[in-house]
């Protein structure tokens, strides 16, 4: 490197002597690929990619926290993997979503909004960016509560280096306004941004995405502001939400640009994470055909090296989820292994890395299935027209059909879909529980949404993780604490937020998560 540096310095010196530094040095010294000159559409795509955790940030937080809190995926290991399994604040992992969104996603998307807001030829890109910005901020505020919002990601634009923290109530009010204006503002007769990687510039699909996200945001407020929730649910339905799985907001990966959850679980974490017993037990008890697509068990494995294809079984009847409340030592005692009928901790069921978590498996942000299930709840509350049972059935069917998007081998035959729907009709007496339990299944592998809707709805009715050492005072973790770095770089503002919100702990409830 030193040799190359000396060579380049010598070359530039020679050029100056031969031509005069003032003549063309400014031209030579101009960075033709300066990020500040990148096309906004390119920056928009990068924001979409980064929000999908393609760069790895946030993935470990989902694995250690969100998936574990909702008891779908769990690890028995501690140290760097400690989290929901031990009801513990692991300061190495709880800041990861914060870091990814503020350092990458929001810096990019705020820049796109700023660069296109006054350009009459880029109104569609401007409104697409506003929708993606709302999606990104929803994840952040749902995860942490009060956060920098109005002054966030404006260090370059406005030289704001210590942004204030806005209340979640104020954030949601603005998110809903932004989604309302941006979704309505999309216009297929104007310049179409055909290079966008989410919908290829399809304005009709972007509109349906925007209104479906508005529905999701509106339903977040069911416990704390039902009047506003109803208002925006009505707006979303009127505007037009997703109509089929073709409208899903999905990131499609390739062999080169991998699904980062799959990347983690196919590499260094391959033997560390397992399907949790409550999730497996629910799917088994209901003869759910999704279990065959989701789970694999390396029957009889007594160590990581024995988790090989010859032992792999996707037969639903042999799947065994790892119980909650154990670490790698206690789950390996002879009594526990005998109780669950497994040879070792490596014998519990895992996520199938050849189907839903193969390296090029898609990742879903907002889906038709989720949207129909939210409409079912809205109809149950009397906030929209339509039949609750019809929305419910459409939502469950949509997710069953969605399994085919992962891999042809994960597709569920129509006969199996129909049999499952026939066996599990909506029970009006248990409608909210049924709807949101199906939402739990339909949101598998979408950590932020799983965590948010579980807190909002209270379903499924999970049992508290019984791990003996716990840092929480609630039955479940309610939010992620702010990064320690914030107390160093933005102390006054973060302290104000902590005081307003009621503490910076795993047990502190965010505004919409009212008891």
Regions found by a protein language model. Give the residues of each.
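Bacterial Sec-dependent N-terminal signal peptides
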Residues: 1-30
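Membrane-proximal, proline-rich intrinsically disordered regions
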Residues: 21-75, 100-103, 107, 111, ...
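C-terminal functional modules
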Residues: 399-515
